[in-house]
Design a protein with these regions (language model features):
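N-terminal, active-site-proximal structural segment of metallo-dependent hydrolase catalytic domains
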Residues: 1-96, 105-116, 159-161, 368-370
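Structured beta-strand-rich core segments of catalytic domains in phosphoester-bond hydrolases
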Residues: 2, 73, 79-190
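Short secondary-structure boundary/capping segments
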Residues: 20-24, 89-93, 200, 249-259
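Extended recognition/assembly regions associated with phosphoester-bond processing machinery
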Residues: 31-34, 45-57, 81-87, 93, ...
Length: 370
């Protein structure tokens, strides 16, 4: 019984306009910053036109990226609401692939911008086996205190024990695939932005992700039992916003790029891997092919890393030992520095920076659920 599973940070699938750039220049789009805008009304009119004009190209490319996964079930991050997801699926994705993702759910999580996690599935796999979404449960309201995960590091950041652990949500989805049980845990962890006190963004925010990762593990162990969790059919999918290794980029297009594999001493998602709790299937690929995101702050700081994960229970990973994931890179912009031999055949109309499918690459894998 096989299921094609994918995860994709679709990057701001919004149904709202953001006019924050009128009062905060740091939030203003670079295209609008070229022009003299006299008042807020004029700014809002221009921002609407800019957003709508770019969105059509962007969502065609996002749909192409999802279509390329050939997935039966897709986990999404950064979705505004169910209306936005329905409009995207019908207006863009359905027109490309026909047989639609009829079952959809969008979480109402804790993100301050209102970007949530979502799941959509077909009614049956591409091989004709029924997919039943039996239940969907949110863990957005779980606090540090409830799971005993509050630490001195979190307190130093101003986070109290009574506060919610997940910055978005951990969505628990119970499925039957051809009569076989399968549980999906979908998450989008705290971003690595916002360094303070002399620390970079990744290091400063790491305690939050450590707690989120530990909470996901605790939720799974509480559900299946600590001793039995390894034997059950489950997967963790999503943008976990941290990496355990990366490809550091040096050089330039004139003298040639150099790519160095670097393994990190610690990561915010380490609790998920301690004692072999789960298996990162992307690590079945060669080291320099595991990346799902290109990060840059100019020539002095560039790397490729994995932020997007499909993590399988040990039993499920063992039953799929011979399978490897696919990372869809055709939607990446031309500014992404890609190692030799990995250059994708990009989708039509991809730009240097935009339009693009997303800043993230979808990850997909066929899994035998037995």
């Amino acid at each position: 019984m096989s299921l094609r599973l994918a995860t994709f940070n679709i990057e701001n699938l919004m149904s709202r306009f953001d006019f924050g750039g009128f009062r905060n220049e740091l939030l203003q789009d670079r295209a609008l910053s070229l022009y003299k805008i006299d008042n807020q009304k004029e700014y809002e009119e221009l921002e609407r036109a800019r957003t709508i004009g770019l969105s059509d190209d962007t969502r065609q490319l996002s749909a192409l990226a999802i279509a390329a996964t050939r997935a039966d079930l897709v986990c999404l991050q950064e979705v505004d609401n169910i209306e936005a997801l329905r409009a995207f699926e019908y207006g863009y994705l359905y027109k490309m692939i026909g047989r639609g993702y009829r079952n959809k759910h969008v979480s109402t999580g804790n993100d301050s911008r209102g970007i949530d996690v979502a799941v959509m599935s077909r009614e049956e796999t591409r091989h004709g086996q029924p997919i039943e979404m039996k239940s969907v449960a949110s863990h957005a309201s779980v606090t540090y205190e409830q799971l005993g995960l509050h630490t001195a590091e979190l307190a130093a950041m101003g986070l109290g024990a009574h506060e919610r652990i997940f910055k978005r949500d951990c969505l628990e989805v119970e499925l039957d695939v051809g009569g076989r049980p399968f549980t999906l845990f979908l998450a989008h962890l705290k971003s690595m932005n916002g360094g303070r006190n002399g620390q970079n963004g990744r290091d400063y925010t790491m305690p939050v992700r450590v707690a989120e990762a530990a909470a996901i593990r605790r939720i799974i162990e509480n559900k299946f039992g600590r001793e039995k969790a390894a034997e059950r059919n489950w997967a963790i999918c999503g943008d976990l916003n941290d990496y355990r290794e990366r490809i550091v980029i040096a050089g330039d297009e004139f003298e040639g790029f150099r790519f160095e594999h670097v393994r990190e001493e610690r990561s915010g998602i380490d609790p998920l891997f301690a004692d072999g709790f789960c298996v990162n299937v992307v690590e079945r690929l060669p080291e320099k092919e595991r990346w799902t995101l290109y990060h840059t702050r100019g020539p002095e700081e560039r790397h490729l890393c994995q932020l997007d994960y499909i993590l399988l229970s040990p039993a499920l990973a063992a039953r799929n030992e011979g399978r490897k994931p696919d990372i869809i890179r055709q939607g990446q912009p031309f500014r992404t520095v890609i190692p030799p031999g990995q250059e994708p055949n990009r989708f039509p109309r991809i730009g240097w920076d935009r339009p693009k499918a997303s800043d993230h690459c979808p990850v997909a894998m066929t899994i035998d659920v037995i």
